[in-house]
């Protein structure tokens, strides 16, 4: 702690002092609340709503409202909020992040600000990390709100849009971050206002805010549909990838060295950079690919797909590992969430990586998907008028929360002092020695009936340890992605005396591990970490499973110099130093230098990851501004506003811009290229061809005026063809929605391509982000021009035959996060026609050159 903190206290301590008087007022109201009957306590809700309507603010009501919830908690659940929980509630109401240690009852804390903010009637979302917690909390904590007369809803993955709409219409809604984000994206793809499920985004309380930020900070939410690409190329590239030789890693050759011209001899066909998870072809590798595909130059634009796919195949073989990153089950590749160790059914890697892994594992390669809508969690949560977060570990990331969400983190003291002992890390030379030591430690604890929880990073490691324990005859349970149905039970039993539980990264959070008396006597829950995780937060989470509410406990991490963390980020010097010391086998190395090296490796990785997320966010910011514009326009169309004026403006804009494109301000009348003007304008607005004979005045502005008037008359004539004026208004909305959606989906794809290409700009001494922004804005302008042209073209060429129906541009086939997997999709009855198939109309042409063109 530095001098300034000693004198003035930390940021959290100063803020807690400021809140102190509020907490006192809530506590002083306790006796008067206890005297109220149930009916009188319930009547408080209506009284508060009335006071709000008469001009009081939520802050005015806070002490009394919190006191009411506190009393209701005691009556309904027999749980009265502790003082520290009241503090947490105030922090959350203020739109900040409350850091509370595991087992301090975060779930109960959220009832306070949720009740207070729900009084406005605008809705409150309590966001959890999985369906199980959302359902549990809604049923459990929901009792308090229902007792006080508020409605409580829960949104689960299996629900229909009707059920979701009803849940979101409640005063308080429990929902997972994925469901909420996807519902927002889906709401921006609906074609009738009645199909919307969400209300405006008012106030969100995000549970485990750090895990939403981390886990998904670098993977945005994606809704996808199928693209028409063939899957053969993946299988061919997989065959080639197996024949290619991996070269020596160019570990120390950084980009800086590359720019400074430091050279090292390349070896092999490709080089893998494990730190940044990148694969690059060497010159020899490029030659091999060209020879295999019989092409002259791999870098040619028409070969970009081959280049992309061979890199994917090499990544699948060298950076993606079975039973660590994914599992193969029932002829399917399923992703394993690296942070929780859970399988995520229905989620797929994007950009073709999933197909490359399918080819590697010889299972059926599914068609590639096309992104229809996407958003990052950070940008999504920033759309709420107010947001707050709860977590057990956020201070390590406080800078990030300030930078990205503009929220500060307040550390809330524990209700009882922590009695857990966190021991120094034990370091061994090799992995084998480390595992041997872990088994010995488990054996020793088991002999004295002390419960043990062993945390591993991969499924493989958990199974290996399980085999070693079985050999020693130690009964135990394993919890990893393969068995996650039993999760809650296994976690709940982990505190029984003599229990040994092995878990991958399990957070398994949300379920408390309760000790029995014998276990408490034996020293409480012993936590063993089998290696340090890249993120200190996950290490702290594992530690925090023990010692809740003042329980005894201990934690210790076992590390070997061969662990990934030490191998990739530890220093070579350190390792060689211990090698020269000649340490005997199975000897534990304890050294301050080692502990520091581990801490600094973790800090290095964290700042690296923060950089990646911040970078992603800066790129997404460009998309975000564009998304806002498109979604706002879409919403206006949905809200049933008349688009008549907008359409007329489009018609006049197009006319003006086409004249401007062909005729310069000082071009002589004789030099006007009318043929060019007709070829640009008439396909969109079918006027009579512009010839010199029918131009009223040989002035550019006069020509613009004349053509605009003709175009407007043309549209008025089209309007007159419709017997009911509302019919053409609806047609305008239908066409606009269709065009906006189709163009926006293509634009998302183009922007993704642009972003991947932006990295190459770095070598051209240009800032990739600046290039991306400039090009992105140009592409957006081009897209809006195309939307105008396509809309006007469609409206002016439409024939009045039957009532128009709105329809979705693309069918959603899936999402990229587990809980939101679309369950059984509706199968199409007729076979899908691909662009190169013969046209079903019988003309003998390819579909894309016949009916496909019209489609």
Briefly describe each language-model feature range.
Residues 110, 438, 824-826, 834:
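Active-site-adjacent structural elements in folded domains
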Residues 454, 502, 744, 780, ...:
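Hydrophobic, well-ordered secondary-structure elements that form the walls
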Residues 61, 302, 349, 393, ...:
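Generic detector of ordered secondary-structure context
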Residues 326-334, 340-347, 549-550, 557, ...:
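Extended, charged helical/alpha-beta scaffold domains that provide interaction surfaces
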Residues 4, 66, 171, 354, ...:
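A generic alpha-helix preference that emphasizes hydrophobic side chains
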């Amino acid at each position: 702690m530095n001098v300034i903190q000693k004198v003035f206290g930390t940021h959290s301590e100063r803020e807690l002092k400021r809140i102190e008087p509020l907490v006192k007022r809530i506590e002083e109201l306790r006796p008067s609340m206890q005297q109220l009957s149930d009916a009188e306590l319930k009547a408080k809700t209506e009284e508060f709503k009335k006071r709000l309507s008469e001009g009081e603010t939520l802050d005015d009501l806070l002490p009394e409202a919190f006191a009411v919830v506190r009393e209701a908690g005691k009556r309904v659940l027999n749980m009265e909020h502790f003082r520290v929980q009241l503090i947490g509630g105030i922090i959350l109401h203020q739109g900040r992040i409350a850091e509370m240690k595991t087992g301090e009852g975060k779930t109960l804390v959220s009832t306070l600000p949720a009740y207070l903010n729900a009084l406005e009637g605008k809705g409150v979302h309590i966001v959890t990390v999985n369906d199980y917690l959302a359902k549990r909390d809604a049923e459990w904590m929901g009792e308090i709100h229902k007792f006080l007369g508020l409605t409580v809803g829960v949104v689960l993955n299996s629900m229909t849009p009707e059920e979701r709409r009803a849940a979101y219409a409640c005063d308080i809604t429990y929902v997972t971050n994925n469901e909420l984000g996807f519902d927002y994206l889906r709401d921006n793809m609906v074609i009738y206002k009645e199909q919307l499920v969400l209300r405006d985004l008012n106030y969100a309380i995000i549970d485990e805010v750090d895990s939403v930020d981390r886990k998904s900070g670098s993977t945005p939410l994606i809704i996808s549909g199928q693209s028409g690409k063939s899957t053969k190329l993946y299988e061919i590239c997989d065959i080639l990838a197996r024949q290619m030789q991996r070269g020596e890693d160019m570990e120390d050759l950084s980009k800086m060295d590359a720019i400074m011209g430091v050279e090292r001899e390349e070896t092999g066909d490709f080089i893998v950079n494990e730190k940044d998870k990148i694969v690059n072809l060497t010159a020899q590798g490029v030659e091999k690919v060209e020879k295999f595909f019989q092409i002259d130059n791999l870098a040619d634009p028409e070969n970009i797909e081959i280049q992309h796919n061979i890199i994917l195949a090499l990544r699948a073989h060298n950076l993606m590992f079975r039973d660590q990153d994914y599992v193969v089950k029932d002829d399917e590749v399923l992703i394993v969430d690296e942070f929780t160790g859970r399988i995520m059914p229905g989620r797929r890697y994007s950009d073709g990586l999933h197909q490359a892994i399918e080819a590697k594992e010889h299972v059926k390669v599914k068609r590639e998907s096309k992104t229809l809508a996407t958003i990052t969690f950070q940008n999504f949560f920033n759309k709420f008028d107010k947001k707050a977060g709860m977590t057990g570990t956020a201070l390590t990331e406080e800078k990030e929360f300030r930078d990205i969400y503009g929220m500060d983190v307040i550390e809330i003291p524990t209700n009882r002092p922590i009695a857990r002992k966190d021991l120094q890390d034990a370091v061994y030379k090799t992995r084998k020695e480390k595992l041997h030591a872990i088994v010995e430690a488990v054996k020793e604890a088991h002999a004295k009936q002390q419960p043990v929880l062993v945390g591993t990073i991969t499924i493989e490691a958990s199974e290996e340890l399980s085999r070693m324990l079985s050999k020693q005859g130690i009964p135990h349970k394993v919890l990893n992605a393969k068995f996650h149905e039993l999760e809650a039970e296994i976690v709940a039993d982990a505190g029984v005396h003599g229990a040994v539980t092995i878990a991958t990264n399990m957070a398994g959070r949300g379920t408390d591990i309760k000790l029995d008396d014998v276990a408490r006597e034996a020293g409480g829950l012993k936590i063993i970490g089998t290696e340090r995780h890249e993120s200190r937060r996950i290490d702290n989470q594992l530690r925090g499973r023990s010692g809740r509410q003042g329980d005894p406990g201990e934690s210790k991490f076992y590390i070997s110099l061969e662990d990934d963390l030490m191998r990739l980020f530890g220093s070579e010097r350190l390792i060689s130093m211990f090698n020269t010391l000649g340490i005997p086998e199975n000897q534990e190395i304890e050294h301050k230098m080692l502990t520091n090296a581990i801490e600094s490796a973790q800090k290095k990785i964290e700042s690296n990851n923060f950089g990646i997320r911040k970078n992603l966010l800066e790129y997404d910011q460009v998309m975000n501004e564009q998304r806002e514009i498109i979604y706002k326009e879409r919403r206006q169309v949905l809200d049933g506003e008349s688009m008549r004026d907008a359409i007329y403006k489009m018609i006049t804009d197009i006319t003006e811009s086409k004249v401007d494109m062909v005729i310069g301000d000082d071009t002589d009348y004789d030099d006007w290229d009318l043929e060019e003007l007709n070829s640009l304008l008439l396909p969109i607005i079918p006027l009579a061809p512009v010839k010199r004979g029918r131009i009223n005045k040989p002035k550019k502005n006069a020509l613009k005026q004349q053509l605009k008037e003709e175009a407007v008359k043309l549209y008025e004539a089209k309007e007159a063809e419709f017997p009911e004026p509302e019919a053409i208004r609806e047609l305008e909305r239908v066409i606009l929605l269709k065009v906006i959606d189709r163009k926006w989906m293509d634009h998302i794809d183009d922007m993704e391509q642009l972003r991947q290409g932006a990295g190459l700009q770095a070598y051209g001494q240009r800032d990739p982000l600046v290039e991306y922004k400039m090009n992105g804005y140009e592409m957006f302008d081009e897209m809006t021009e195309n939307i105008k042209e396509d809309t006007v073209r469609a409206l002016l060429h439409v024939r009045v035959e039957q009532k128009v129906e709105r329809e979705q541009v693309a069918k959603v086939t899936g999402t990229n996060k587990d809980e939101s997997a679309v369950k059984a999709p509706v199968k199409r009855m007729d076979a899908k026609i691909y662009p190169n198939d013969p046209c079903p109309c019988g003309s003998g042409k390819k579909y894309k050159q016949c009916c496909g063109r019209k489609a």
